[in-house]
């Protein structure tokens, strides 16, 4: 699967590192970095974007809202799905989850979407403590895998809360970005979805 990642000043580096590490070579990544200074209002965003996108999926990590919107237009015209976490873009084929780990399953996202997005876990216990955790689907930054390894040995009744706390230490999102719809910062949202994933996994294991 060909994935094109757009970033500004290293804004996607942690995600790309996680995808390469935990994607099991399922994805072919191409980076487009736009590191030049941009004006507050961008009228000619096309000048900074490729004329044609050769990809099955686009990941938008651009910081400039006008540039991200122009990229969304380009993807919509080309019929290429785009994931733009934390933004409010309304274009056909554009998905805007609150965080990268808030992405729901969508067949349009192909192999990437089956491996990365809202966390899905399986767990093993000895009746009292967590003895094993497998990540079936997790955050592209890799935080799900990191945090899951840290709760081995925790009491079952503390595991969900602990995972939520651990992921907040790993999360690379900006904690100052408050989402009025969800009533949480991206970091707190990440903690919430991981806690719920562990609760679901524990319910299934019993």
Predicted regions and their residues:
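Structural motif
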Residues: 6-10, 60-64, 85
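Glycine-rich, highly charged phosphate/nucleotide-binding loops
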Residues: 34-53
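N-terminal glycine-rich "phosphate-gripper" loop used for MgATP/nucleotide binding
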Residues: 56-71
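Structured beta-strand/loop patches that form or line metal/cofactor-binding pockets in enzymes
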Residues: 95-127
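Active-site- and interface-proximal helix/loop "cap" or "latch" segments in soluble metabolic
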Residues: 113-120, 129-206
């Amino acid at each position: 699967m060909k994935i094109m990642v757009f970033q500004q000043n290293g804004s996607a580096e942690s995600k790309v590192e996680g995808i390469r590490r935990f994607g099991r070579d399922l994805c072919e990544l191409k980076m487009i970095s736009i590191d030049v200074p941009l004006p507050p209002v961008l009228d000619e965003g096309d000048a900074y974007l490729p004329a044609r996108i050769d990809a099955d999926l686009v990941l938008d990590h651009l910081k400039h809202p006008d540039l991200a919107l122009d990229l969304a237009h380009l993807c919509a015209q080309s019929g290429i799905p785009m994931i733009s976490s934390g933004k409010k873009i309304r274009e056909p084929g554009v998905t805007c989850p609150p965080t990268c780990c808030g992405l729901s399953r969508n067949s349009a996202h192909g192999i990437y979407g089956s491996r990365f997005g809202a966390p899905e876990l399986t767990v093993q216990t000895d009746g009292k403590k967590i003895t094993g955790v497998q990540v079936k689907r997790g955050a592209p930054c890799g935080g799900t895998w990191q945090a899951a390894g840290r709760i081995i040995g925790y009491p079952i009744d503390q595991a969900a809360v602990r995972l939520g706390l651990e992921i907040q230490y790993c999360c690379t999102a900006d904690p100052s970005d408050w989402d009025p719809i969800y009533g949480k910062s991206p970091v707190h949202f990440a903690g919430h979805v991981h806690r719920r994933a562990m609760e679901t996994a524990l319910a299934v294991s019993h």
